[in-house]
Amino acid sequence: MRMGEINALHPEDIDLKNGVIHVRSTISRGFDYRAYVKEGTKTYNGLRDVPISKKLRPYLEEALERKEEDPFNLVFYDYINDSVINTNQVNCYFQRICSDAEIPSHGQHSLRHTFATRCIESGIPPVVLKTWLGHKDIHTTLDTYTDVFKKMDQSAVDKFDTYIEQV
């Protein structure tokens, strides 16, 4: 998910019963540079359901349990400044965490890229990943992660050889 989509989640968007997150809105910045919740996402294809993994589920449960009241009914909200959390805030916080841990930071969007890379490496079909990422078409996914697919060429040939030997 994009950071703006995560920051715009409402409790009803997290469907623990069916194990999905309904992505329906995002955080945008107005002409006055203030963040606000925008119904809809970056693209039409951004409106989607993303499955909740077993590892993510307990964190979402905790976020829902700890949620306080706020004017926008968001799962993640800046209660200290009484405002919507924007991507710049998340980037600053992420860079601070990386600095404290003495690891290089490439911005929080790198987490999305790493997630997609690990999905590809684990064998998740590109057409499924396209939907999870909210890409308009498969070419966006394939073009963005070309380097990952190229690294998997030899593995694919080895799989094919094993299959052919069994036939």
Indicate residue ranges for each PLM-predicted region.
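Short, charged phosphate-coordinating catalytic segments
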Residues: 1-27
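A short, basic/aromatic helix-end/turn motif that makes direct DNA contacts
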Residues: 8-14, 130-136, 146
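C-terminal secondary-structure termini that scaffold catalytic or DNA-interacting sites
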Residues: 13, 18, 29-31, 36-47, ...
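Short, basic (Lys/Arg/His-rich) helix/loop patches that form interaction surfaces
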Residues: 50, 66-74, 79-84, 88-135, ...
